C-alpha cells in the first residue's frame, strides 16, 4: 500500500514539474545590427533630409539639370528640370531612370511620382521650400493634392 502511494505521489510530482515548465517559444525576430528599418520616419526634418538625398540621386540621371523632391507618407514626388534640347521622346526614359534611382536610394518608398512638367516641378519646389522653412505639411496639402492629381506613378 505504501509502495503504491509513493508511486502515485512520484507521478503527481513528475506531472506537476512537467506541466509547469514554461513553453519554449522562439524569440521574436530582430533587425540585425546595421540593418535598415522598413518604415520611413515621421519627423518632417528627417523626411526633408531623405528628400534632399533622393533629389541628389535623381539629379545624377543623364540630361537632368536639377531635381526637387518631397516625401509624404511612403510616397515621393520628384520634379526634374531637364537640360535644354531634350526631345519629348526621351523624357519617359529619363523619368523611368530617375524613378529607379530614387527607389534604389530609398527602398522604403512605396510609390515614386516623377514629372518633367514645368508647372508641376515649380509646385513641388514650392512645397519643398515651404517644408524646409518649417511650414507644417497640413498647410501644403492642397498643393500636394494638386500635384498628385497631375502625376502618374512611375515606380511602385
Task: Please report, for each region that a protein language model flagged, where it lies by residue.
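C-terminal motif of bacterial Sec signal peptides marking the signal peptidase cleavage site
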Residues: 16-19
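Short edge beta-strands and adjacent turn/loop segments
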Residues: 59-82, 116
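Short, non-transmembrane amphipathic alpha-helical segments
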Residues: 51-57, 87-109
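Bacterial N-terminal signal peptides that target proteins for export
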Residues: 1-8
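N-proximal, solvent-exposed amphipathic alpha-helical segments enriched in charged/polar residues
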Residues: 30-32, 36-67
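Hydrophobic helical h-region of N-terminal Sec-dependent signal peptides
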Residues: 9-14
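C-terminal low-complexity, charged extensions that often adopt amphipathic alpha-helices
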Residues: 99-156
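Bacterial signal peptide processing site
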Residues: 21-24
Amino acid at each position: 500500500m505504501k509502495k503504491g502511494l509513493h508511486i502515485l505521489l512520484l507521478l503527481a510530482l513528475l506531472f506537476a514539474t512537467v506541466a509547469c515548465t514554461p513553453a519554449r517559444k522562439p524569440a521574436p525576430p530582430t533587425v540585425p545590427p546595421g540593418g535598415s528599418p522598413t518604415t520611413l520616419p515621421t519627423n518632417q526634418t528627417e523626411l526633408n533630409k531623405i528628400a534632399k538625398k533622393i533629389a541628389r540621386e535623381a539629379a545624377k540621371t543623364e540630361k537632368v539639370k536639377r531635381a526637387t523632391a518631397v516625401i509624404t507618407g511612403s510616397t515621393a514626388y520628384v520634379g526634374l528640370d531637364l537640360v535644354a534640347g531634350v526631345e519629348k521622346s526621351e523624357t519617359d526614359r529619363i523619368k523611368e531612370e530617375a524613378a529607379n534611382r530614387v527607389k534604389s536610394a530609398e527602398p522604403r518608398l512605396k510609390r515614386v511620382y516623377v514629372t518633367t512638367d514645368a508647372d508641376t516641378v515649380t509646385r513641388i519646389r514650392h512645397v519643398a521650400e515651404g517644408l524646409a522653412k518649417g511650414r507644417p505639411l497640413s498647410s501644403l496639402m492642397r498643393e500636394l493634392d494638386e500635384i498628385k492629381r497631375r502625376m502618374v506613378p512611375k515606380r511602385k
